[in-house]
């Protein structure tokens, strides 16, 4: 369910950010890995939280990890 929802509601870039978020990467590390600005990462993280109904990064990471684990 989490994976289906993630695939349906997140943009491709939000999925990229979410995967790194689920691995425990900081905003700075995500920005460096994806070649984007930290402020852009923060915007994507905010969108991910809103779209997945998560209250914080940890909860979002759990949603994302659970979705990946079902594949």
Per-region residue spans from a language model:
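Regulatory hinge/linker segments at domain boundaries
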Residues: 1-19
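Basic, Lys/Arg-enriched C-terminal extension of HTH/homeodomain DNA-binding domains
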Residues: 4, 50-71
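Phosphate-coordinating loops and pocket residues in cytosolic domains that bind phosphorylated ligands
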Residues: 12, 42, 62
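Short, locally clustered residues in the helix-turn-helix/winged-helix DNA-binding domain
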Residues: 22-23, 65
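Recognition helix of helix-turn-helix DNA-binding domains
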Residues: 24-59
């Amino acid at each position: 369910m989490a994976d289906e929802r993630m695939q349906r509601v997140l943009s491709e870039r939000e999925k990229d950010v979410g995967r790194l978020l689920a691995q425990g990467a900081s905003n700075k590390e995500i920005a460096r890995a994806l070649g984007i600005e930290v402020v852009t990462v923060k915007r994507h993280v905010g969108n991910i939280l809103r779209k997945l109904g998560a209250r914080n990064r940890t909860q979002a990471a759990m949603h994302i990890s659970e979705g990946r684990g079902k594949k």
